[in-house]
Regions:
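N-terminal leader/linker segments that precede catalytic domains of diphosphate-processing enzymes
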Residues: 1-61, 72-124, 163
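Nudix hydrolase/Nudix homology domain
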Residues: 1-2, 14, 63-66, 107, ...
Length: 163
């Protein structure tokens, strides 16, 4: 989010030269720079011991392609706690091991997505109301079910070691 008004006092921001940052919004009333902000989210490639990845269908995200488990961090929650919670909420699975992979800026929605590999024991899914369907997909078939170049596609490609 780029600030036009101060979120603390409501004053209109002015552009001010701030060191190496250059021109940026500044609140003269509060005497503070107004740094751009983003929503921090997680995205998980959920994998099992059979070399399969859990892919989800969520109509509100894509009518034609699959996605990965993803969600917004809650205040006071670590990224790892968010990832474990989202896997449990969306798929009803318990994470055995969590590995951080990398971060992915998603400028279109002003988000920073933190990518994880979540290792689970293969089991039937207990889907949340926001998931239309999910399936275990062999590593060799996973990328073709995701939108090429999407953050989910990039994460799964890294996790399964595809080139």
């Amino acid at each position: 989010m780029k600030y036009t008004f101060c979120p603390h006092c409501g004053s209109k921001a002015v552009l001010k030269e701030i060191g190496d940052e250059g021109l940026m919004p500044f609140c003269e009333q509060c005497s503070i720079p107004l740094w751009d902000t983003f929503t921090t989210c997680i995205i998980c490639a959920v994998v099992n011991e059979k070399q399969e990845v859990a892919l989800l269908r969520q109509g509100y995200v894509s009518a034609t392609k699959y996605v990965c488990v993803a969600g917004v961090m809650k205040l006071g929650e670590s990224a790892e706690e968010t990832a474990v919670r989202e896997v449990a909420e969306e798929l009803g699975l318990t994470v055995k091991k969590m590995t951080y992979i990398q971060s992915y800026p998603y400028e279109k929605k002003e988000m920073l997505m933190l990518g994880f590999q979540a290792d689970v024991q293969k089991a039937d899914f207990q889907l949340s109301g926001e998931v239309d369907a999910a399936e275990w997909v062999p590593f060799a078939e996973a990328l073709e079910k995701l939108r090429e170049g999407s953050i989910a596609w990039q994460l799964v490609k890294t996790v399964i070691g595809a080139s």
